[in-house]
Amino acid sequence: MAMNLKNSSSGGNLTSSPSYNSFSSLNLSGNSFNNGSGSGSGSGSGSNEYIPLCFSKDVFTSNTFEVDQFISDCRKRVNLESVQKDLREYSKHLDSELIELINKEYQSFFSLSTSLVGFDTILNEFSISQSSIKSEIKSFNNEIVKVRGLVEDKLNEKKSIEQKKKLLQLYISISETLNNMNHLFDQLYQLTHPNDFKKINNNNNNHTNNETNINDGDVLELLIDRISNSFYQIQNQMSSLTNDELKFNIFQSLSLKIMDLSNKIEEKVEPIFKESLKRFINVNNNNKEIVDDNNEKQNKYDERILLVCLKTFQTIDKLNVPYKLFKTLIVKPRLAQIVSLRNLEINKSTTDGLSQIYNSIIEFLKNQCSSFFDISNLINNNLKEKQSNNNNNNNNNNNNNNNNNNNNQINNNSNNNNNNINNNNINNNYNNNIILYNNYNFISQSVLPEIDESLGFFKQIFATGIPDLFYKNYYLTFNFIQSIEVNFLTNKELLTQFRQSSSYSSLWKKWNFAVYFQLCFTNIAQHFEFNYLRIPLFDQLTLPTNNITNNNNNNNENNNEFYLKSTDGLRLSMDKCWSNSNFIFDLSSKFFKLFLQLIARYDTFISDTLIPLELELQQQLQQQQLQQQQQQQQQQQNIGDSVIKITPKSPPSLSNQSPISSSTTLNNKQSSPENFIYIISDIYKIKSKISTNYKELIIKTIGNHQNQHEILNLINDGILESCKTLEQLIPRISIIIENHLISKCLEPIEIISTLRSTYRMTNKPVPTKPSIYVSNLISPLEILINNKASSLHFIPPEIKLNWAISVLTPVTESFKNAATNLIQSVTQSNDIINKMVKKSKPTTTTSGGDMSDMDKISLQLYLDVDKFGLYIQKFGINLLTFEPFLGLKSIVEPFKKLILNQNK
């Protein structure tokens, strides 16, 4: 098949090569390049036809087109020669389409070429004009830059002048304030002249001039307040300066003047504060007995004076002055009267008076000093409100400045610079005007240091020789400090300052907690060790009497909670760790560690008692295994001789596990399994108390604190670990109990072998009841679990069930082995006898019927095993899942038919 590409306008044609049968003649994308709707050759309408290509033409217009990828894809379908041929055909097709397009729009194309004539001249003229405009703009921009630089220089110069002017005005303002303060000092001096000051202070004696004196007192209050406010104003003004500005000589000189001014204020105000403080405290003390108008007026006057004086000391940042005066004038003399050896030692060489001393101090602070503390708290509250208002104003001004800055962005450059200068100055003023002052805390700075110093002279208060006395004095001091915190430190910030003060730390450092705890540790640990752990474990047992009813048993259990004295001693020792007469919170971790150590010592005491018994048991088990091996070898050697004899002697024990001699297992009667049950009961009781009662007691005693969650985790982990340690004793004791029970239960197992001699040629009647030895197999276990352990409610039922399973498993296995050996022995004997007698009638039949001796033995075994299963069920063991019994049952199950035959 061939396809012609014709150029209708030029009459030429492009003819493709003959068609070929290859993949290149197919359009793999499912499309063919056709300009017409038909499939025939081109017509005069200009439609072209060509061979379908091995690629799609859309691939060339894709944004992800890559030559290497294109060639690789095409090579997967056709060879390179076919691709090259198709590309050439497609190129010719594109050329043909381009020619057709030009011929179709030839008139437009020709018009376009005509319209472009002379256009290059216009472009050249436009380029020249553009270059001229560009140079003019550049020169204008240079002029603008020069003018802008000049304007910025002028603005900076103006800014510098304004800043200097501002600093000069600030200097003048501060200087004027200093001069005004000098005038205030002169007025204060005139008012506080010794003669005038005495006149003011003698209000109680001169009743006629009382009103005049009070007016003078108002003037004095006003003067001190003005001095304080003026100094505060100077501080604010100085705080507006930057660090560089403060280095100026004029401001350095001002700083020195301000320091001198601060000292001068202290010098002037201190005597006024001292006299007013004395009078105020004395008036408060006297008002408890005498109340009149003069005292009340004087008290109000002194209160106002103290208020402004404290405010002034706070402003000049000299809080140590009122602290020192209050401590020296008020606290020290009174504490010297209260804290004395006479008051402390009511009885000679004792500290019985410490409680009264602390009560007297609290009473003194409440009655004489509480009003003064109220004044200091009022100043603290006012300061807090003032700082809060300053913070709010600062935030508002910052918001306003941000708004101004946003508005200023649309102004011209000069306005922006000016506004920025002003805004920066405003920001500096508001930011630096916030001056932080300290709160007054006379309790931590005046009262507590004097208390610490006064108590330090009496070493007997902190003596650790007698733990009970040490604990008593400590808790009196602890309650005393707590009373001060509750009554006088209601503010959280003041309470924090109080507890972080050096005097607070110094007071508690006087108490030698390490020595006290060592004494407590020695007292508790040695008492537990020597009084309870030096006695052998089984000698401590207090066993309940047998002739009591269940109710009486319960009452006895309540009266004597534990059977071991060491368990009761452990309880008493643990109680001492958290008792109100021993526990100190600062030693919480040490007392908790002692608590855990006591439990560990109790565990070690019981464990040390078990170790020799476990070693003895291990040796006996090894001897037992050796005996079993020797018996098996002897049995294999003599098995032929033992079956030839018609009436052989009873063979040795046929069980796989020989019983351990009860005379060597636990030769001490006190260390019997019954006594071990009481030990297990004590372990469960004390473990229950530790995990519940003592855990709650410890958490309650320690109380709530910041790291409460972490403390609870430590307590839980420690108690859990101790309880796990105690629980590990239970399996060890259980093994001793179980092995003793196994040896006791296996003693009757040898009776099984006597069934052969019982029914062999004895003409015994057919058995109808189980043998007596079956009950003896269970009797030791039944007595222990159903009688001894049943009255001890603290032993869990699952422990009793585990004991039953552990004991009955080897007993049942031994029963199975003995029954198997018996059946095999009787069967072999019958076979040999039958061969010897040949065809004679067997002599093993009885007069009671046709049942043989072999059948009687088998029937007796079946009855015994069936009864044994009933006994096992009484212990709560499911026979359907108890594998040892299922194996035993399978041996005697075929003999069940003998009962059915007998019934017939």
Swiss-Prot record:
Its main location: Golgi. InterPro entries: COG2, COG_complex_COG2_C, COG_su2_N. One of its GO terms (cellular component) is Golgi transport complex. The keyword Zinc-finger does not apply. Residues 388-424, 652-663 have a biased composition (Low complexity). It is a peripheral membrane protein. It comes from the Eukaryota. One of its GO terms (biological process) is Golgi organization. Keywords: Golgi apparatus, Membrane, Protein transport, Transport. Residues 384-424, 644-669 are annotated as: Disordered. Pfam families: COG2_C, COG2_N. It is found in: Golgi apparatus membrane. Belongs to the COG2 family. Component of the conserved oligomeric Golgi complex which is composed of eight different subunits and is required for normal Golgi morphology and localization. Required for normal Golgi function. This is Conserved oligomeric Golgi complex subunit 2. It comes from Dictyostelium discoideum (Social amoeba). The lineage of its organism: Eukaryota, Amoebozoa, Evosea, Eumycetozoa, Dictyostelia.
